Amino acid sequence: MKKDDISRLLQRYLSAREMGKEPYFDADEVDELLGSFEESDNYDYFDEVLALGLKLHPGNTDLQIRQCKLFVYNEDYNSALALIDSIAETDNQDLDLLRLECYCMLDRYDKLIEYTEKLIEEDCDYLETVFEYTAPLLSDMEMNNEARDFINRGIDLFPQNLVL
């Protein structure tokens, strides 16, 4: 979406907000508006617009994923996991990476390995990304033995990987 279109969406939102009204946006418009906030690193209205989007389109997976990311950002990992579990979509890279990040942050290496093994069994298309994304999280959490084990598992599967 063009910058002018995003500006119009934001202006429409702010005008309605100023008048005490609730504007209507389709799910794609909400997603575009949220994306523009992220790109500009301006989160002044992010929570409000996301809440409005989820109110208008509660079953929209993209908006639910943004809510999960917000939970993770706010370190509310249990809420993020509960929402991830409630989303009926499978084989979704964003959801799987968020789930694994939550397991790392909750110090649940057992669950992380269990879920990773499930992804391996399902021959997940983005399995290499799972290892590349998750290994640094384990290191950041100072779970050094677990990080080493996870990296070794990844190297066993992807011996040519230079990131691991």
Regions found by a protein language model. Give the residues of each.
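Start-of-helix register in tetratricopeptide repeats
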Residues: 24, 28, 62, 94, ...
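Structural register within alpha-helical repeat arrays
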Residues: 32-33, 66-67, 99, 133-134
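Residue at a conserved register position within TPR or TPR-like alpha-solenoid repeats
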Residues: 36-37, 71, 103, 138
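Canonical positions in the second alpha-helix
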Residues: 53, 86-87, 118-119, 153-154
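Short coil turns that delineate tetratricopeptide repeat
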Residues: 58, 90-92, 124-125, 159
